C-alpha cells in the first residue's frame, strides 16, 4: 500500500466507524443504515422485509442474535415495533440506537453478549413509513401522519376478541399479522408517543386478564428503569399513572389494538410504551430519549427468559 493510499484509508476510517447520529432518518436513510449494520455484522444479524406499505415502502425487520436467520430450539423470539403511528417518531430512533448498542457491545459487554447469544431479537423500526413521511418534527399534538396512506389508524385495525372490527385490514397490518404467525414470539413491546407510561392488556375490556400480575410486572420493569416514566407526572395534563404504568382500558379503550391481538390471538405478551410527551419532538432531544430508555429496553428484553421455556414437537 502506498503512502498516499494509506493516508486516504486513514482519512476514511473515522467515517466507517462513526456512531449513529441523533437525528431523524427518513425511509431511505433507515434502509441504508440497516443494510450497513447487516453488512458489518453478518454473523449475528439478519435483515428482511415483512411486506410493503400502501405507498410501496418496505417494512424492514432487523434481527440480532447468535442464530439470526431462523428459529433455534431453546432460543426465545422477542420483538420491538415502533412508529405504527407515523407521527410518533421517537421509538423509531430508539430502535436504531438499540441496534447499534447491541452490535457494538457484543462480546465486550457481558449483559449484551448473553442477550444476543440466548435471544433472537427482532426490531421493526417503522410499521408506518408512509405516515412518517407525511409528518414533521416539532409537531407535538396533531394527527398529521398518524394514519396510513389509506387513512386508517393501524392500532385500531387488528382483529378484536371483544367486538367485531369491520375496518378493512390494511397492508401494514396484514404484514405484521403474517409476521407474528410466522414466528413464535414470546414477548413484545410497541413504541408510541404523546404520553409517558407503560400500558398493558386488556385494551378493549375492563376484565382482568388471567396473566394480570405478569403484565403489571413487565410494564413496571420497563417503567422503573426510566425515571421520567416512573415519576408519573412528566407530561402536562397527565396524572394518576402509579409508578408509570396503567391498564390500557382503564386509561382509554382501544378496539382493534395490536397489543391485545398479540396477547389473545398469538399468546405473545405485548405492552405499549408511550415514551415522549411530544409525539414528534425536536431532534435535539433524541439523545436524551435514548439515555432515558437505554436501560429499560435492555431490561425488558431480559424478561423473555423469565419463567419456563418449552418447545413442543409433534411427530
Regions found by a protein language model. Name each.
Residues 2-19:
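Cleavable N-terminal signal peptides of Sec/SRP-targeted secreted and luminal proteins
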Residues 16-22, 80-82:
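Acidic/histidine-rich, surface-exposed loop or edge segments in extracytoplasmic proteins
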Residues 22-78:
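Soluble metallo-hydrolase cores and metallopeptidase-like ectodomains found primarily
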Residues 67-220, 224, 228, 232-236, ...:
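Active-site/substrate-binding loop(s) of hydrolase catalytic cores
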Residues 246-266:
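Short glycine-rich, acidic/polar surface loops and turns
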Residues 307-315:
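A short, amphipathic beta-strand motif
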Amino acid at each position: 500500500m502506498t503512502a498516499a493510499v494509506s493516508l486516504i484509508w486513514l482519512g476514511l476510517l473515522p467515517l466507517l466507524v462513526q456512531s449513529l447520529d441523533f437525528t431523524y432518518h427518513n425511509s431511505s436513510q433507515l434502509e441504508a443504515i440497516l443494510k450497513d449494520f447487516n453488512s458489518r455484522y453478518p454473523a449475528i444479524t439478519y435483515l428482511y422485509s415483512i411486506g410493503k406499505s400502501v405507498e410501496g415502502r418496505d417494512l424492514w425487520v432487523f434481527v440480532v442474535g447468535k442464530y439470526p436467520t431462523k428459529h433455534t430450539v431453546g432460543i426465545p423470539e422477542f420483538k420491538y415495533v415502533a412508529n405504527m403511528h407515523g407521527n410518533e417518531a421517537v421509538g423509531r430512533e430508539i430502535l436504531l440506537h438499540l441496534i447499534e448498542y447491541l452490535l457494538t457491545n457484543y462480546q465486550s459487554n457481558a449483559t449484551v453478549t448473553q442477550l444476543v447469544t440466548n435471544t433472537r431479537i427482532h426490531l421493526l423500526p417503522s410499521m408506518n413509513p408512509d405516515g412518517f413521511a407525511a409528518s414533521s418534527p416539532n409537531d407535538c399534538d396533531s394527527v398529521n401522519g398518524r394514519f396510513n396512506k389509506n387513512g386508517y389508524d393501524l392500532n385500531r385495525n387488528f382483529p378484536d376478541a371483544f367486538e367485531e372490527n369491520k375496518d378493512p385490514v390494511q397492508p401494514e397490518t396484514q404484514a405484521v399479522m403474517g409476521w407474528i404467525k410466522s414466528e413464535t414470539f414470546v414477548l413484545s413491546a410497541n413504541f408510541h408517543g404523546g404520553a409517558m407510561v407503560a400500558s398493558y392488556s386488556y385494551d378493549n375490556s375492563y376484565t382482568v386478564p388471567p396473566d394480570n400480575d405478569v403484565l403489571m410486572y413487565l410494564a413496571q420493569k420497563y417503567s422503573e428503569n426510566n425515571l421520567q416514566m416512573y415519576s408519573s407526572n412528566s407530561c402536562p395534563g397527565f396524572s394518576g399513572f402509579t409508578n408509570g404504568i396503567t391498564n390500557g382500558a382503564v386509561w382509554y379503550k382501544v378496539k382493534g389494538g395490536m397489543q391485545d391481538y398479540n396477547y389473545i390471538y398469538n399468546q405473545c405478551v405485548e405492552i405499549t410504551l408511550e415514551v415522549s410527551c411530544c409525539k414528534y419532538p425536536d431532534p435535539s432531544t433524541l439523545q436524551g430519549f435514548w439515555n432515558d430508555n437505554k436501560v429499560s429496553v435492555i431490561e425488558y428484553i431480559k424478561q423473555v427468559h423469565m419463567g419456563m421455556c418449552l418447545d413442543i414437537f409433534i411427530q
